Amino acid sequence: MQQSLSALVLAAGKGTRMNSRKLKVLHEIAGLPLVCHVIEAIKPLQPDNIVVVIPSGHETIGDVVKPAAIKIQQNALGTGDAVKCGLADLKTLSGTVLVAFGADPMITTETLKKMIEAREIENPPDVVVLGFRTENPDRYGRLVLDDDGKLERIVEVSEADTID
């Protein structure tokens, strides 16, 4: 079993495509904000801590995600920067860091558990990434894999073309 598990929940996205003034993670499904569904899926994994990365100026999200800690991303510089921001609070920890998107309310504890278990093998991968195949990838970033199926790079949707 993994000795240490921490969770980062990325909740700093503005949700521009939703055409709403409300942050994407605060929209509700079944009476709960999206971000709360994600946190509820993480809790059964019993992480040492959960840190929710939020955008500057939206500190009230902290009330919604309690008792999870919050980390403010001062400048919205993308997903990678949000992870870097959240990891700053976890530098002294060892073990696995689970990174989840706060606007993915359908993620299940079982799926997250399988991702963690993928790191509990001999010679584990440094990174386990959850992705999906779609008929129409135009709206999504890309996970580019090498010939062995290993992650080569992640391409943001704004930088992707039909080759990626």
What are these model-predicted stretches?
Residues 16, 24, 59, 126:
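Glycine-centered loop/turn positions within well-structured domains
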Residues 66, 107-164:
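Conserved core of the sugar-phosphate nucleotidyltransferase
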